[in-house]
Amino acid sequence: MKDMAKVYDIRIEDFNYPLPDERIAKHPLAQRDECKLLLYKGGECSEHVFREIPELLPADSTLVYNNTRVINARLRFRKPGGGALIEIFCLEPLAPADYALSFASTDGCEWLCFVGNSKRWKEGKLALELTVDGKPVTLYAERNGQSGNAFRIRFSWSDGAVTFASILDAVGEIPIPPYLNRNTEPSDTEDYQTVYSHIEGSVAAPTAGLHFTERTLADLDRRGIRRRELTLHVGAGTFQPVKSEVIGEHEMHTEFISVTRSLVEDLLNAPGKIIAVGTTSVRTLESLYYIGVAIHDGDEDPLHVKQWTPYNYKGGLSAKDSLKAIAGYMDANNLTHLVGSTQIIIAPGYEFHVIDGMVTNFHQPQSTLLLLVSAFVDGNWRSIYDYALDRGFRFLSYGDASLLLRQ
């Protein structure tokens, strides 16, 4: 068991650093894989270009990335008669709760949403006129209750042959990060997606993957680096600031995860290092370990990892035995996909079980993502970030990348 009190009492102000606005990349480079890459290996930093990553990864590595695709989650309505602007930000489906079924709906669906200017919309339907495949369609939104600071929104529309996915594609906007301090631009439609994204459901991109190009992927294949994928749908909670003084008082957001039976097998038989692309892949792979532990221990609800589960676990099960438990569970239940959720917080004091390295961007001060990086590099995050700041690296979602390796 980890020293729970020490983790609980981690002060978020200890993870602050000066980040001038001019160091926040507002747009990506024209050629994604020409960005800078910081390599952290053996406690030392060195500067490279991202396209060199196939040569920098250890031989026989398995690279695991998040195949989620960002949806056009932001909808802008106006109250009747040219009234107040009401912005609806779709977070996750409620009915149907399955992402694919909700996107395929033709007779309405319900989502959990943030609502901008909600005080000006207490009741009644909002209507939005749009065009889908050349045909006029009216989208309606109606409040159906509240959950914390979010709302249950019932969507319906006038044409029963049109899917909700088509509506979002036609009139929704890509929700770029708020810290970019700019409106969504047409270029973001392509720029804010990874080249390998194909499972729709995120409201934010797994940004470490934005640097990969078809050229980089081909070079990885030529070098014999295995490429595998998983799914974590990134929620708006990824931008949620830590408002408490200590981590123990911060509540992590819950996110949907999905892995295939073949990925579990590939992890079991990986000949070399397992490298996660992005913190979302890190959180999914490390959550898998605790799902396997729960299955092994016979828990009634093994597919949902709680925030503090890792720090309450007494230990003992190897990563291989955990993955074998998952494989057995999937085979026994005839599952090709394991679908669950995770609320895991990875902070200094966390013991990594699955990953040996990660590709990640440079994160906001006082964020849970910075805590995750610190946990992986044994507290040396500040020397890494000082190196990046001193050498002109660009920060946050559209910024440069790092490859963090353990010896």
PLM regions: where:
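Surface-exposed, charge/polar-rich loops and edge strands
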Residues: 2-407
